[in-house]
Regions:
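Phosphate/anion-contacting hairpin/loop surfaces
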Residues: 69-184, 190, 197, 202
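Gly/Gly-Pro- and Ser/Thr-rich, intrinsically disordered tail segments characteristic of DNA damage-repair
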Residues: 1-118, 300, 313-314, 319-332
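Basic, nucleic-acid-binding surfaces and adjacent catalytic neighborhoods in DNA/RNA-processing proteins
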Residues: 22-39, 53, 151-332
Length: 332
């Protein structure tokens, strides 16, 4: 799932392409947006786009006349900006969910199941927005609000709480793994068990690593570390493997050596959320894969499986067929 840095870069591209331009055509294929446009025909046509911005994983465009559009990528969505006469505009891909055309550019949304439109204050009209915690890329980052919201969940593990978008908006699976590694924290430690130094570290590393990922295309390690990972055969998978293993400290580096110590990076499913099903009354559990270094992060031995470094250092199958089937549960 695209996280805060990726969505912010999308918002930047759309803002550059659309802000100040007049909309010549506006169309949507998602059920809710399509119904709204049917009730308000031509509402967006002829109106000027004022700005496009992001809050966490949510992208919002404000349009003249108190109008707005809103998207959430979930796992697969993406905005593309192309020329108005591009083939993609002429042919209309079946994955397209929305399109916004001006004289100078076309913005096409693919595969995202969440696209809504409306009139009024987005924070009043879009239920998810007012619940969001501080944006991880906000300048300055509201560390006090982040720590206050984190402290409201004393019985959750830190690894689970960081995925809660009401705590901090924009953290997903790669950022939480990297943040916890940077703070040398056990993902299974309870929020109530954190000391002052750990809280301060989280408040510092959440915006720091998010900003680095935003500025460097998702990379969370310094350039020197990435070069070391790429050059040292022992620190990466075989050449045909995905480039993720040279972009991060621990994320998707299972069974590779930690770049700080001699241990191996591990992965394990972590319980991140549970709720009671309204119909069956049964408890439903949501788990996500967490990546960590047992030694650097002092992880409780009960969560540490034996390292299985592969001869050709291929990534485990589970890394590329990640069974995260409910992206909305923690990442709304």
């Amino acid at each position: 799932m695209p996280e805060g840095p990726e969505v912010q870069r999308s918002a930047d591209r759309l803002d550059e392409a659309l802000a100040g331009r007049t909309i010549r055509a506006f169309d949507a294929r998602t059920k809710v947006a399509k119904a709204w446009l049917a009730d308000h025909p031509g509402a967006f046509v002829g109106k000027r786009v004022e700005r496009v911005w992001a809050h966490g994983k949510h992208l919002v465009g404000q349009v003249e006349g108190d109008l707005f559009f809103h998207s959430h990528y979930l796992m697969w969505g993406k905005w593309h900006v192309v020329a108005p006469d591009d083939e993609a505009v002429r042919t209309r891909d079946r994955r397209e969910r929305a399109r916004i055309l001006t004289d100078d550019a076309a913005a096409l949304l693919y595969s995202a199941p969440k696209f809504t439109v409306g009139r009024g204050d987005p924070y009043a009209e879009i239920p998810a927005l007012p619940r969001l915690g501080p944006d991880v890329l906000a300048e300055p980052f509201d560390a006090d609000a982040f720590l206050d919201r984190l402290g409201e969940q004393p019985d959750r593990t830190v690894g689970a709480a960081l995925l809660d978008q009401t705590v901090a908006a924009g953290i997903g699976n790669y950022l939480r793994a990297e943040i916890l590694y940077a703070c040398r924290m056990d993902p299974w430690r309870l929020v109530s068990e954190m000391d002052a130094d750990e809280r301060d570290c989280l408040a510092r590393e959440v915006p720091h690593l998010s900003q680095r990922a935003y500025e460097h295309g998702g990379r969370t390690v310094p350039e020197a570390v990435q070069e070391r990972q790429a050059e040292d055969r022992d620190l990466r998978y075989s050449p045909h493997a995905h480039a993720w293993n040279t972009r991060h400290w621990v994320f998707r580096r299972t069974n590779l050596p930690c770049v700080t110590c001699d241990d191996y990076v591990r992965q394990k499913h972590q319980l991140t959320r549970e709720w009671t099903d309204d119909e069956s009354g049964e408890t439903v559990e949501k788990k996500r894969i967490i990546y960590f270094c047992p030694t650097c992060q002092g992880v409780d031995p009960q969560y540490v499986t034996a390292a299985r470094p592969h001869k050709d250092r291929r990534p485990p199958d589970s890394e590329w067929a990640d069974p995260e089937q409910d992206p909305e549960a923690d990442d709304a």
